[in-house]
């Protein structure tokens, strides 16, 4: 019987998506995220509140590696990447890393217990791929395989991106998704009526993961996934460009985004910690955008900019 190695990284909630990305890049066959915030004040299936869940800013991200993997090298790489993330200003907290061996059947089911359907916005619900789910009238279901995911849609940065897309898209638009990761924003754009979506990621693993998740959802043939370095070399104009990545990377794409966004189109930027907010605003204003909406969840910010000559009700430019 094949055995697996389980590695659990205890890290600050703000680093969830970045650390999940690192674990996938180092060869993990899946990630699971345990976050006390998902349970605070919620009821279990029998109607009882979870009594023993204590709120914490720290979460546990668990990854699974084949038994042949050299765990010492993996853990060293994880620690190096965490130090680099901290140097970008991302809060990682007091990190600890644990490991243990698991039998095949334990690995196959262990991570699934962390995921249940989650209503993210008024219309959008994210459902694990193995779950049978009866959608209500008007509810749009995004199927994801969280075992592969770079983000399952429940992180504040992704939630705010999804909310912005839901507010903007009315049908028939062209959307560009920069740093697509799990593909969740592209899938949502398709479900919300966008005509064509172009999804780019520098990471070949992310491109594969995004395509696999897209294939789980019917009617998403209008999503085109490809490897790409932000918006370099892209000539396709878009009604909406969305990017949910680190602030230091967002500032590198604002000029290209202005070149590609159509008149009266939108740029959605998320993944911005508060201390980097002014830097992103300055880059977008310098490119020529006007700020229409600023959303905040905890230390995270999302910004919706517009390319327009009508500056009533908008800021900057």
Swiss-Prot record:
GO molecular-function terms, A-Z: protein-lysine N-methyltransferase activity
Keywords: Cytoplasm, Methyltransferase, S-adenosyl-L-methionine, Transferase
Keyword flag Methyltransferase: yes
An individual GO BP term: methylation
GO cellular component, one term: cytoplasm
Binding site for S-adenosyl-L-methionine: 158, 179, 201, 244
Catalytic activity: L-lysyl-[protein] + 3 S-adenosyl-L-methionine = N(6),N(6),N(6)-trimethyl-L-lysyl-[protein] + 3 S-adenosyl-L-homocysteine + 3 H(+)
Class in the EC hierarchy, top level: transferase
Domain of life: Bacteria
Compartments it resides in: Cytoplasm
EC number: 2.1.1.-
Location (main, coarse): cytoplasm
Protein task: Methylates ribosomal protein L11.
Stored PANTHER family: ELECTRON TRANSFER FLAVOPROTEIN BETA SUBUNIT LYSINE METHYLTRANSFERASE
Similarity remark: Belongs to the methyltransferase superfamily. PrmA family.
This protein's name: Ribosomal protein L11 methyltransferase
Organism of this sequence: Streptococcus pyogenes serotype M1
Gene that this polypeptide is encoded by: prmA
């Amino acid at each position: 019987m094949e055995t697996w190695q389980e590695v659990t990284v205890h890290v600050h909630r703000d680093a969830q998506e970045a650390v999940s990305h690192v674990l996938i890049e180092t060869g993990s066959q899946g990630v699971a995220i345990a976050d006390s915030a998902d349970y605070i004040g919620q009821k279990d299936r029998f109607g009882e509140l979870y009594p023993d869940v204590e709120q914490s800013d720290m979460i546990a991200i668990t990854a699974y590696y084949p038994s042949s993997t050299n765990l010492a090298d993996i853990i060293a790489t994880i620690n190096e990447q965490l130090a680099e993330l901290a140097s970008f200003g991302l809060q990682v907290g007091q990190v600890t890393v644990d490991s243990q061996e698991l039998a095949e059947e334990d690995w196959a089911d262990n991570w699934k217990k962390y995921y249940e359907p989650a209503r993210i916005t008024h219309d959008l619900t994210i459902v694990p791929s193995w779950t049978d789910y009866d959608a209500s009238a008007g509810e749009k279901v995004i199927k994801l395989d969280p075992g592969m995911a770079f983000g399952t849609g429940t992180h504040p940065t992704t939630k705010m991106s999804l909310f912005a897309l839901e507010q903007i898209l009315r049908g028939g638009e062209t959307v560009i998704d920069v740093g697509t990761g799990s593909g969740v924003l592209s899938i949502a754009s398709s479900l919300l009526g966008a005509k064509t979506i172009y999804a780019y990621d520098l990471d070949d693993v992310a491109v594969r993961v995004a395509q696999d998740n897209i294939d789980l959802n019917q009617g998403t043939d209008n999503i085109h996934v490809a490897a790409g370095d932000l918006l370099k070399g892209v000539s396709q104009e878009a009604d909406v460009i969305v990017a949910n990545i680190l602030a230091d990377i967002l500032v590198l794409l604002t000029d290209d985004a202005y070149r590609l966004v159509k008149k009266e189109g939108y740029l959605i930027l998320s993944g911005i910690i508060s201390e980097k907010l002014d830097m992103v605003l300055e880059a977008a204003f310098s490119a020529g955008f006007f700020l229409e909406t600023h959303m905040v969840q905890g230390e995270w910010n999302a910004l919706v900019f517009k390319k327009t000559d009508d500056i009533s009700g908008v800021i900057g430019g």
